Amino acid sequence: MAKQGSKEKKGYPELKEVIKATCKIRVGPGKETLTEGNCLWALKTIDFIFEDLKTEPWTITKMYTVWDRLKGLTPEETSKREFASLQATLACIMCSQMGMKPETVQAAKGIISMKEGLHENKEAKGEKVEQLYPNLEKHREVYPIVNLQAGGRSWKAVESVVFQQLQTVAMQHGLVSEDFERQLAYYATTWTSKDILEVLAMMPGNRAQKELIQGKLNEEAERWVRQNPPGPNVLTVDQIMGVGQTNQQASQANMDQARQICLQWVITALRSVRHMSHRPGNPMLVKQKNTESYEDFIARLLEAIDAEPVTDPIKTYLKVTLSYTNASTDCQKQMDRTLGTRVQQATVEEKMQACRDVGSEGFKMQLLAQALRPQGKAGQKGVNQKCYNCGKPGHLARQCRQGIICHHCGKRGHMQKDCRQKKQQGNNRRGPRVVPSAPPML
């Protein structure tokens, strides 16, 4: 079937690159990827099911139409597995057509379902607004900003599913990765400046990278001030960044240029930090080696940071942060013990003072002693429990010697059976008391 379809339609030449990208998507984590035959099977099957769409080119609009029609079909019991495979393969092709790169088939289905939910919410909202504004179709709708007939706009917060999708991409690929940049550029075109910066601040990522991104944004703002002197029709940095504006004010038409500039600044900052991360000598890649002293590591780190083309406050932040996060495990533990909760804010000099003995013979002996020290419930039981008789820790009440009087000698501190003045009589049931002592010197 695949060979025949390829001959008839020449392998869907308009989808050549899309199919090539789809073949990189895995069926599951650690499993095999989709093949060209899988894609051709799905496309040919769809053409067979929906013959009225067969002659139309495979655009994203046609794919969404097919997707909606497939949802309305109910397969037979014996065909449910093939039908699920058809939907999953189509979801992967749709993601590739939109430029997305999901790692697995399940991720592709999740992306399409998420976008479908956004589309349904948008349509539901449009039906309500259309009752008040019948000519709404003549105006362009910008989600979550909606142009209304009267000239104003309404604002809606970023959908949670979109935020979660961006969080997932940031955790899997990194905050400055191309995948995150592509996703942010796709969704943020209709966000206010406040939305863009707030979402970026709440994304998971390296603290040093976030500080570098903020530094790049400050550089873009300074460049804007130099190149655009204040004037009646000139946007200010505060307007571009959404400072001092409500969400309703930021969503108005006069702020469209400001939103576009803010998004461009963020994209430029992400790309700059990404290029910096892959450049040789990147400070974030300078980490302490197992056999390297902390002083030598700090010397390499400071040299790399000083060579970076960033401002002095960012250099100071990188020195304070990376001197802890990029240190070895032993040095981090030593800094935690010495500096406590202020370890992240401590200066480099304080951290060097705390780690001066790491790697020495005395430090190694200390680690060995800690490793050999008894732990667990058995080792803590005698230390934590207190005697109910005398109130002192280290023994139980039945083991307490305080207040005990020997009935043989009349002295305190031991019982009659343990009395040393008592003569041994015959073979006792318990035998003679054994007193620990060192072996004799031979």
UniProtKB/Swiss-Prot annotation:
Pfam families hit by this protein: Gag_p24, Gag_p24_C, zf-CCHC
Q: Where is this region: Disordered?
A: 420-442
- Asked if Lipid metabolism is a keyword of the record, the answer is no
Please give the InterPro entries that the UniProt record associates with this protein.
Gag_p24_C (IPR045345), Primate_lentivir_Gag_pol-like (IPR050195), Retrov_capsid_C (IPR008916), Retrov_capsid_N (IPR008919), Znf_CCHC (IPR001878), Znf_CCHC_sf (IPR036875)
The annotated site for Cleavage falls at F363, K364
Q: What is a single cellular component term in the Gene Ontology annotation?
A: viral capsid
Tell me one GO biological process term: viral budding via host ESCRT complex
Q: Where are the zinc fingers (CCHC-type)?
A: 385-402, 404-421
In which domain of life is the source organism classified? Viruses
Sample GO molecular function, one term: nucleic acid binding
- Signal peptide boundaries: none
S-S bridge residues: none
Keywords (A to Z) from UniProt? Capsid protein, Host-virus interaction, Metal-binding, Repeat, Viral budding, Viral budding via the host ESCRT complexes, Viral release from host cell, Virion, Zinc, Zinc-finger
According to the UniProt entry, where does the motif PTAP/PSAP motif sit in this chain? 436-439
- What is stated as this protein's family in its record? Belongs to the Ovine/caprine lentivirus group gag polyprotein family.
Per its UniProt record, what PANTHER family does this chain match? ENDOGENOUS RETROVIRUS GROUP K MEMBER 24 GAG POLYPROTEIN-RELATED
Q: What is known of its domains?
A: Late-budding domains (L domains) are short sequence motifs essential for viral particle budding. They recruit proteins of the host ESCRT machinery (Endosomal Sorting Complex Required for Transport) or ESCRT-associated proteins. Nucleocapsid protein p14 contains one L domain: a PTAP/PSAP motif, which interacts with the UEV domain of TSG101.
Q: What is this protein called?
A: Gag polyprotein
**Gene name of the encoded protein:** gag
